[in-house]
Regions:
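Conserved pre-motif I regulatory segment
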Residues: 1-28
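Walker A/P-loop
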Residues: 22-44
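Conserved helicase motor
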Residues: 57-61, 82-89, 110, 222-225, ...
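Inter-Walker segment of RecA-like/P-loop motor cores
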Residues: 62-96
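Conserved helicase ATPase core of P-loop NTP-dependent helicases/translocases
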Residues: 62-68, 228-232, 239-271
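Conserved RecA-like P-loop NTPase helicase motor core
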Residues: 106, 246-250, 257-332
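Post-DEXD/H (motif II) to motif III coupling segment of the RecA-like Helicase ATP-binding lobe
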Residues: 107-169
Length: 450
């Protein structure tokens, strides 16, 4: 055996086995980015008494996993690693598969993935899926593939165990995405690209120089054009930067990544390359330049910078306000197979933000009722959006209170009228409620008191 698993990895593995023992044939294992899920499924494949098919969604991940199997001295005589698209086109070329492992299972197209899983299930194979964020972009359920789910540690626990590093979160500016259209669960790329003005590039470069000039950073951009522009802006500022995307030739990509690992390149800008499982060492800072409505994508991007190293603290510079949509990297999240994740609440019940940004040092922190920034200790002034929501809440409370008071007044009036025993009682009721003496006279006469 080439791999020694950690306690939490063994617990996840045991949990999956327990579900299989109950009769489930398809189990989804959830483990936060950086939790070492690839080591878990490599151990599974190594122990399988039959042929194992490992499915990935990109050829780069296939090559990476094959390399990891070899590096850990795991024989691959009965292990096949292939993209789900390739397997879908020639499913009959893979006979006698006993176990199917699906890495980054939430990223597979539902129809293609289901066809592949159903094919091998008919042959008697069982399926184990792995994901750090089991929610598809379009919000659709994953219960069409998996019948049960086993959860491993979340980000906060892995930070506590020193398996992920702590972080500092800065939000020097944000962008207004309220008017952006969505397509398949996320903002339309062309609209996001138009939103990202050159002024934002200048600000992120200034903040990088101020906060983490010695750290190597990865920048997540919204398009190839955007990524290239950001790399050019960093280079013009005297900071070695390079752009990568899925179309970058393999040899060129390997050369640039080697230069990054060697410290020759300080900033790697990319589009969807390092946010989907592909790993790269040496990242000390994450630059968020792509607003996203996808929690899964946001978690993957944050996770690239949280790989553990002694004394490392990752710097996250969020220039697009993703924290306001998705919270902080180590927030606890409730996952279900239905793809529904409890949405991050921007406001507390009192109208204040659940996550605040200090306007002085730009640090982002959880709102625990502090009157000042826990980092720079400047007094925290309520944001205009907080004040607006607080005012709306107060107006609602006033309205509700007025309605309740009026209902109580009417109930008391009804009771007083019922208990009136003489004309004088009606004149007293009129006085208390601001009614005229004519009202009292009429009521008393109706009762026969006058």
């Amino acid at each position: 055996m080439g791999i020694t698993l950690r306690d939490y990895q063994l617990n996840l593995l045991d949990g999956a086995r327990a579900e299989l023992a109950k009769g489930h044939r398809s189990v989804l294992c959830v483990c936060a980015t950086g939790g070492g899920k690839s080591y878990i499924f490599m151990d599974m494949a190594d122990r399988c008494k039959g042929k194992t098919l490992v499915l990935v969604h990109r050829s780069e991940l296939r090559d990476q996993h094959i390399s990891e199997f070899k590096k850990n001295n795991i024989p691959m005589d009965n292990i096949i690693v292939e993209t789900v698209q390739t397997v879908y086109r020639r499913m009959d070329s893979y006979p006698d598969v006993r176990m199917v492992i699906a890495d980054e299972a939430h990223l597979f197209m539902a129809r293609t993935f289901k066809a592949v899983i159903d094919h091998f299930a008919e042959q008697g194979a069982y399926t184990i899926g792995f994901s750090a964020s089991p929610c598809r972009l379009d919000g659709s359920s994953m219960s069409d593939i998996f019948s049960t789910m086993v959860e491993g540690p979340q980000t906060a626990e892995l930070i506590e165990k020193k398996r992920l590093c702590p972080y500092e979160y800065y939000a020097p500016l944000t962008v207004d995405v309220s008017e952006l259209k969505k397509q398949r669960g996320d903002y339309v790329t062309t609209e996001v690209e138009n939103l990202m003005e050159p002024a934002i590039y200048g600000r992120v470069i200034a903040e990088y120089k101020r906060l983490c000039p010695d750290k190597q950073a990865i920048a997540f951009c919204c398009s190839i054009k955007h990524s290239q522009q950001v790399a050019d802006q960093f280079a013009e500022a005297g900071i070695m930067a390079a752009h990568l995307d899925g179309n970058t030739p393999k040899k060129e990509r390997e050369r640039l990544m080697a230069a990054f690992r060697a410290g020759e390149i300080k900033v790697l800008t990319n589009v969807n390359l390092f946010s989907e499982g592909l790993s790269v060492d040496g990242i000390g800072a994450v630059l968020m330049l792509r607003p996203t409505a996808s929690l899964a994508l946001c978690l993957q991007q944050w996770g690239r910078g949280l790989r553990y190293a002694e004394n490392k603290v990752c710097t996250i510079i969020d220039c697009v306000g993703n924290y306001s949509r998705h919270g902080l990297p180590d927030d606890r999240r409730e996952w279900t197979l239905e793809g529904k994740v409890k949405e991050h609440k921007e406001h507390n019940e009192d109208g204040t933000f659940t996550v605040r940004q200090c306007p002085f040092c730009f640090k982002v922190f959880e709102n625990k009722g502090q009157k000042e920034c826990p980092y720079c200790h400047e007094p925290y002034p309520l944001h205009s959006r907080e004040l607006k929501v607080i005012e709306e809440i107060e107006l609602k409370r006033i309205t509700e209170a007025e309605v309740k008071a009026e209902e109580e007044r009417k109930a008391r009036l009804k009771e007083d009228i019922r208990n009136a025993r003489c004309a004088q009682d009606f004149f007293e009721i009129a006085r208390k409620n601001g009614y005229s003496t004519g009202w009292a006279f009429k009521r008393a006469r109706m009762r026969g008191y006058i």
